[in-house]
């Protein structure tokens, strides 16, 4: 069966499963080394001085952005993490003093006491991506809705974080899908 015989949602689900399977097959040691290497590429991001960067708390076998976030903090950027809220994600400040609460899915989020921030740069987890900047998330639409809301109040740089093995030759884009501005993998940063 060709992809032209199925809906974009079905294609995305197949690609999501394939990419997540590839990611799950990576060794534990490789995942650690790849996550650490993100910080080695921090200067390739070329972020404006003092911008606010939203990261994420990794779940399952996602690439771990915490070494990168620490490198960004050392460069003077304010950090925040997403919190699932209605009608879309909000972002709370992340500092060394931040208290965390369980946020479901095995992840942590800053407590409600943390200041809510509007990020300039959104570092996003993903299941799969292609060379045009299209991404497949986990199917809940949290980031799509957050991006749409954040773009109402100004520019937003959307950067995916992933392992190279999550790249696919072609990811279908639907009208609600916003392409990423760049991708950072263990091999470095690519701007789309």
Regions found by a protein language model. Give the residues of each.
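Short polar/charged helix/loop
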Residues: 139
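Short phosphate-engaging motifs
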Residues: 64, 87, 142-143, 167
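Surface-exposed, charge/polar-rich loops and edge strands
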Residues: 1-10, 14, 21-24, 113, ...
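Short glycine-rich anion-binding loops that position phosphate/pyrophosphate groups of nucleotides
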Residues: 58-61, 127-131
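A structured binding-face within diverse protein domains that lines the active/interaction site
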Residues: 109-110, 125-128
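Short, well-ordered strand-loop elements centered on a beta-strand within folded domains, enriched
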Residues: 87-93, 134-136, 158
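N-terminal active-site beta-alpha-beta segment that forms phosphate/nucleotide-binding
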Residues: 2-117
